[in-house]
């Protein structure tokens, strides 16, 4: 398959470039900027995009444009740092700008295939402190802004382009169109990426790999593992062995709902009741990182033991399926960089492959979350499963601040249920990206009737986001929040105060722990 190869120079927006190109119907993949020539050639590249990044071309050990990229004889587009790296490579001059350009700017463009179908002036998003001061020989200006006289450039052959702004972010008007013009008009690539084609090809591929053997899958009920389950079920039917571990840290009635949902879809799941084991392991633990590690290790132990029992029962389980997504693959590579700062330990089953005697199948490893949801629709999963809000791997343990107790779990489950139920009743659930309740480690004084109370506090959190990388707090109606708070205080024993979290990400993370 022909591929647009995006080389990653460290920008926080790099994944968005791949997503925007795919959204337009062209297959794209992301590789580190210093990927070997063979890695790039293996993807059958039809165009190269150099991402932005935080470096300066004059820094020691600054990332550069690999020589082989220029010898592939395919179109190249440099974005922000990618533009500066190209200019530097060809002998132009890049310098520190006296005025850092960050945020909106008006771009004025010349007539060019890159801007075909666009107005003469439009808004773009800038984020740079260096800027191009002199073009290399054979390059021309095709776009400028007030502070960037060389905001868009190309060479005379119309094969090498550079833009100082970020077409991949939604703040840039017509950004997706610019990327599409580069791929379709300059690289002359034909559309080759549709989800329904992916589904039929993936089912065929799984059949070919697995044959008559069985595949075990750790099922959470979330969209990723549910889509993996449906793909596998379409491919191998009852040779799928889905295992659902009930940690006791799930939402109210969630275990029963997952079982019923999959039974309706004709998929039998194996439920493991491990509630006591997880609660015992978490006894008196308050540190969020420690909670995550304990839950991760306990999950691995439970899943390992269950897998061995099922292997003994069925005999021919040869594969372990995982719901790994493309961002997971990218982040695992990024985490190897010295500059990558760990914010939280991610809960996953990464320790499983080494312990289990199975080969790994990751049907979604090159997909983004929005693409997974599209596959869910093609496979006719219920909308309630496809549009389910994200839920952390460690479950309610990281929504209970402090010690995890049976009482705290019970209170939080009921409060969270009321919040979600009211969001759905008021047609607000699908308008927020994620919503949940948090159990706080404090008590507050209250009055109920003629009596003083001293009870627990619940925080409500709802955010709007595109991909979870950044998020704004949701401006839910005051009347709605008032109703939810009243219901929680009246219906959940042990709560006398409800607060609403109005912090965006950054500076906060979406989850409290």
UniProtKB/Swiss-Prot annotation:
InterPro entries: Class_I_gatase-like, GATASE, GMP_synth_C, GMP_synth_GATase, GMP_synthase, GMPS_ATP_PPase_dom, NAD/GMP_synthase, Rossmann-like_a/b/a_fold. It catalyses: XMP + L-glutamine + ATP + H2O = GMP + L-glutamate + AMP + diphosphate + 2 H(+). Catalyzes the synthesis of GMP from XMP. PROSITE patterns: GATASE_TYPE_1, GMPS_ATP_PPASE. It comes from Thermosipho melanesiensis (strain DSM 12029 / CIP 104789 / BI429). The active site is at 80 (nucleophile), 166, 168. Its EC number is 6.3.5.2. GO terms for cellular component: cytosol. Homodimer. HAMAP family: GMP_synthase. This is GMP synthase [glutamine-hydrolyzing]. It comes from the Bacteria. It is an enzyme of class 6 (ligase). SUPFAM superfamilies: Adenine nucleotide alpha hydrolases-like, Class I glutamine amidotransferase-like, GMP synthetase C-terminal dimerisation domain. ATP binds at residues 220-226. CDD domains: GATase1_GMP_Synthase, GMP_synthase_C. Residues 3-192 form the Glutamine amidotransferase type-1 domain. GO terms for molecular function: ATP binding; GMP synthase activity. Residues 193-388 form the GMPS ATP-PPase domain. Pathway: Purine metabolism; GMP biosynthesis; GMP from XMP (L-Gln route): step 1/1. The keyword Nucleotide-binding applies. Keywords: ATP-binding, Glutamine amidotransferase, GMP biosynthesis, Ligase, Nucleotide-binding, Purine biosynthesis.
